[in-house]
Structure formats: structure tokens, C-alpha cells
Curated annotation (Swiss-Prot):
<keyword id="KW-0032">Aminotransferase</keyword>
<keyword id="KW-0663">Pyridoxal phosphate</keyword>
<feature type="modified residue" description="N6-(pyridoxal phosphate)lysine">
    <location>
        <position position="214"/>
    </location>
</feature>
<comment type="subunit">
    <text>Homodimer.</text>
</comment>
<keyword id="KW-0368">Histidine biosynthesis</keyword>
<dbReference type="GO" id="GO:0000105">
    <property type="term" value="P:L-histidine biosynthetic process"/>
</dbReference>
<dbReference type="InterPro" id="IPR005861">
    <property type="entry name" value="HisP_aminotrans"/>
</dbReference>
<dbReference type="GO" id="GO:0030170">
    <property type="term" value="F:pyridoxal phosphate binding"/>
</dbReference>
<dbReference type="InterPro" id="IPR001917">
    <property type="entry name" value="Aminotrans_II_pyridoxalP_BS"/>
</dbReference>
<comment type="pathway">
    <text>Amino-acid biosynthesis; L-histidine biosynthesis; L-histidine from 5-phospho-alpha-D-ribose 1-diphosphate: step 7/9.</text>
</comment>
<dbReference type="InterPro" id="IPR015421">
    <property type="entry name" value="PyrdxlP-dep_Trfase_major"/>
</dbReference>
<dbReference type="InterPro" id="IPR015422">
    <property type="entry name" value="PyrdxlP-dep_Trfase_small"/>
</dbReference>
<dbReference type="InterPro" id="IPR015424">
    <property type="entry name" value="PyrdxlP-dep_Trfase"/>
</dbReference>
<dbReference type="Pfam" id="PF00155">
    <property type="entry name" value="Aminotran_1_2"/>
</dbReference>
<comment type="similarity">
    <text>Belongs to the class-II pyridoxal-phosphate-dependent aminotransferase family. Histidinol-phosphate aminotransferase subfamily.</text>
</comment>
<keyword id="KW-0808">Transferase</keyword>
<protein>
    <recommendedName>
        <fullName>Histidinol-phosphate aminotransferase</fullName>
        <ecNumber>2.6.1.9</ecNumber>
    </recommendedName>
</protein>
Length: 356
């Protein structure tokens, strides 16, 4: 009689999964962490809620109301979750039948769309972006049959550019009555004029993902938002955990979304954009850098000569970047988070010293 192992008991698709290689999971012993698009310095908050003996609200009113006001939408159009990553997963769980429906995304882009779908057992379809990383609308149209959710990251991670708004409109028309279009706006605070939040009234099948991890400098909080019309939010409420936000997280999130918190965030954005432009200018002068791409975010994508050697050399010096070589069309590319001036200088000095 054959022995059944624990692994044999697992679902087949889970046995075949490769875990998402987050920046933190890839690790390293660095002291200059420029690999996860975090804000470089800690922001301080005091906990005000001393009710840890009670379960929290499922959707804390102060957080929802503050975010709705900030985003210019109604409270009924906001869902808060454990990071935008949970929002990605909730949309698949609510709209996709495993083994029947598919999601679609356009690489090179954020890795969690595929990981979430594969975990749930939902097919992933990809339509690579065009040479300028804009959407291949014809390619998307050809593959839409059976697709229930389309993910588009704008500004796109890791390339840093915005998706053309006219292409978004075309995509929303193509998918009307067929699929949900998810605009991942994790980095929208760095280019707020480009948000699609004002389009919700026009497109009942539009959902928008947001986060407090980037410009709000709260990656450790794990707090994200889905903006969508009430019908979508009501469906997501059926599949979300009963208490997605702990009391301390809700407390800090509400403070971060107060008028003073939003003002502080906007000041951080101004500072990061200034630092980004400084770093872009310096990178363009460095011999081992072949190309620096424009960015609307808090990170810069650049193509290097001997990028793997450069990546390892900086890693060995305690400077941790994000290698993008495995992404379609990004051979030779590394992604650099915009940090402090001191961190920028460490990167610049290390790259200048590279012999290529």
C-alpha cells in the first residue's frame, strides 16, 4: 500500500505553484533597501484606540469615510482590505469560476495578478504590451472571450509610465457587459491627475485599486482600497474576511487619511519627485547605464550593461535593487526605488565605480 504524503493531499495547482518572490522574501543583508518601492523613512503615529479586547468593525467607518472624501467618491464605493493585494484576490474570487473563467493582464507588470489567479485555480491570459509599454488593444480584444477580470497597472510597475487614457476608454468599451476592468493605481499619488476615480459613474464595470503602502509611507500597515460601484463592492463584501483590518491598522489608517495626514503625504510626494529627477539626471551620466526610462512614480527603471553583474556588485555592497531581467522585454533592466539623498548618492557612487 502506497503512503500518501502531505504534499499528495494538496490541491494540484498549489503543488505546482512557485511562491511570489516579494522584495522582502528575496532578502539580502543590505542597508540601502531600494527594491520594494517603500518610502525611505518611518512616519510616526500614536495609537488612540484602546479597545483591543473587542473585534474590529469589518469596514471601519472613519477609514472608509476619510478615504472616500480623499478619493472623491461615495463611501458606498469604497472597500478597505489587507493591502491592495487582497483586493486583487477578492475580485478574482467574486467574479471568476475556477476551471472556467480567466483573468487577463499585460506584461511586463506587477506579479500578484497571476499569483492570485493561480492560487485560486483560474486561468491567466497575457497580452504583452507594445514597444512603448502601452496596451495592445487588438491583442486584448482577440483574447477576451471567457475573460472575467482584466488588470491594468497605471502607472505601471515596474516600467513607471501611465497608460494612455484613451486606451483605457477603448478597453472599457470592449469589456462592457463582459468583464471587470481593474485599474491598479498603487502609485497614483505621484501623478494624481491621471486617476480614473472620476470615471466610476460612466463605467459600472470599472474597479480601482489603491494602497497606503507607497506615498502614504505605510507599507508595514497592509492597508489597501478598492474603489468601485456599489454592485461590485456588495459582491466583494460577500467574499472578504469578517475582520480584514485590525484595530491598530484602522486607527493609524484613519489618522493617515485626516487632512493633516493627506497634507503630509503630499509633501512627501513633492520631495520624492524632486529626488527622482535628481537620480534620473545622475544615472544618465553613468557609463554602465544604457537607458533610463521616464517615470511617474517613486521608482526608476533603467537598462544596464552587464546588469546581473551590476546587481550583484551593488548587492555585495549592501545596496539592494530589484532585478527585472526575467520580465518580458526587460532584459538588462533593474528597478531602483527613490530613497533619501544619501541613498541616491550611495547608488550613484557605486554605479560610477562599475567597470564594464
Amino acid at each position: 500500500m502506497s503512503t500518501v504524503t502531505i504534499t499528495d493531499l494538496a490541491r494540484e495547482n498549489v503543488r505546482n505553484l512557485t511562491p511570489y518572490q516579494s522584495a522582502r522574501r528575496l532578502g539580502g543583508n543590505g542597508d540601502v533597501w531600494l527594491n520594494a518601492n517603500e518610502y525611505p523613512t518611518a512616519v510616526e503615529f500614536q495609537l488612540t484606540q484602546q479597545t483591543l479586547n473587542r473585534y474590529p468593525e469589518c469596514q471601519p467607518k472613519a477609514v472608509i469615510d476619510n478615504y472616500a472624501q480623499y478619493a472623491g467618491v461615495k463611501p458606498e464605493q469604497v472597500l478597505v482590505s489587507r493591502g491592495a493585494d487582497e483586493g486583487i484576490e477578492l475580485l478574482i474570487r467574486a467574479f471568476c469560476e475556477p476551471g472556467k473563467d480567466a483573468i487577463l493582464y499585460c506584461p511586463p507588470t506587477y506579479g500578484m495578478y497571476s499569483v492570485s489567479a493561480e492560487t485560486i485555480g483560474v486561468e491567466c491570459r497575457t497580452v504583452p504590451t507594445l514597444e512603448n509599454w502601452q496596451l495592445d488593444l487588438q491583442g486584448i480584444s482577440d483574447k477576451l472571450d471567457g475573460v472575467k477580470v482584466v488588470y491594468v497597472c497605471s502607472p505601471n510597475n515596474p516600467t513607471g509610465q501611465l497608460i494612455n487614457p484613451q486606451d483605457f476608454r477603448t478597453l472599457l468599451e470592449l469589456t462592457r457587459g463582459k468583464a471587470i476592468v481593474v485599474a491598479d493605481e498603487a502609485y497614483i499619488e505621484f501623478c494624481p491627475q491621471a486617476s480614473l476615480a472620476g470615471w466610476l459613474a460612466e463605467y459600472p464595470h470599472l474597479a480601482i485599486l489603491r494602497t497606503l503602502s507607497k506615498a502614504f509611507a505605510l507599507a508595514g500597515l497592509r492597508c489597501g482600497f478598492t474603489l468601485a460601484n456599489e454592485d461590485v463592492i456588495n459582491l466583494l463584501m460577500k467574499v472578504i474576511a469578517p475582520y480584514p483590518l485590525s484595530t491598530p491598522v484602522a486607527d493609524i489608517a484613519a489618522q493617515a487619511l485626516s487632512p493633516q495626514g493627506i497634507l503630509a503625504m503630499r509633501e512627501r510626494v513633492v520631495q520624492i519627485i524632486a529626488e527622482r529627477e535628481y537620480l534620473i539626471g545622475a544615472l544618465k551620466e553613468i557609463p554602465c547605464v544604457e537607458q533610463v526610462f521616464d517615470s511617474e512614480t517613486n521608482y526608476i527603471l533603467a537598462r544596464f550593461k552587464a546588469s546581473s553583474a551590476v546587481f550583484k556588485s551593488l548587492w555585495d555592497q549592501g545596496i539592494i535593487l530589484r532585478d527585472q531581467n526575467k520580465q518580458p522585454s526587460l532584459s538588462g533592466c533593474l528597478r531602483i526605488t527613490v530613497g533619501t539623498r544619501e541613498e541616491s548618492q550611495r547608488v550613484i557612487d557605486a554605479l560610477r565605480a562599475e567597470q564594464v
